[in-house]
Amino acid sequence: MRSRLTPQRITVHSRSVLLEAAAQVIRFSLAAWVGGTLVVVLAAPLLFGEIGSRDLAGRIFGELLRRFEAVKHVLSLAIVLATFAELETTRSLEGRRFVAGAAAFVAIATNVYLAMVVRPRLAYFRMKVGSFDETPPENPWRVRFNRLHRRSTVILMIGWISAAVALAARPN
C-alpha cells in the first residue's frame, strides 16, 4: 500500500503568518547587522588605542572581524531565505520592498567580497609585513596592507549603510 502525500493548501491566514515571520526575520537580521557593525566600528579605535602592540591589537581585532563575518554569513542566509519567502507570498518586489531588497543585496555582497577577497589578501600582506611594531611605515608590504585596509574600511561602511537603508526602507 502506497502512501500519498496530499498537497497542502496555503490559506490566506497561513500566507499572512509566513509573510509576518519573514518580515520579522529580515528586520531582526538587518538590526543585528547594523548593531554589530556599530560595535565593531567602535571597538577598533579603542583596541588600537589601548593595546600597546599593533600586532596584538591587529590579531585581536582580526579575530573579532572574522567571527562577526561568520555571524553576517548566517544573517545573510536568513535575509535571503526570508526574502524568497516574501516573494513567494507576495509575488512582487515593488516600492519600499524593492529598495530594501536592493540595499540588503548590496550589504550581503560587501560581506561576501570582504570575506572571500579582501580579508585573505590582508592576511597575506600581514604575513609579508611580519611585525607592524617593527616594520617601518614605508615598507612596500605595509604600504599595500594599509591601502587595502583603507579599501576594506570603505567597503565595510558601504555594507553598514546599505543594511541600515534596507532596515529603514522595510515596509511596516
Annotate each predicted stretch with a short phrase.
Residues 77-79, 159-163:
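Hydrophobic cores of alpha-helical transmembrane segments in multi-pass inner/ER membrane proteins
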Residues 2-5, 10, 14-98, 124-142:
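Interfacial loop at the N-terminal end of multi-pass membrane proteins
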Residues 25, 29-32, 103-106, 151-155:
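Physicochemical signature of membrane-embedded alpha-helices that form the seven-helix bundle of GPCRs
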Residues 105-121:
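Mid-bilayer segments of alpha-helical transmembrane spans in multi-pass integral membrane proteins
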Residues 166-172:
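Juxtamembrane boundary at the C-terminal end of a transmembrane helix
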Residues 100-101, 110, 114, 162-165:
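Alpha-helical transmembrane bundles and membrane-interface segments of multipass inner-membrane proteins
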Residues 64, 140-159:
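Individual transmembrane alpha-helices with interfacial aromatic-anchor signatures
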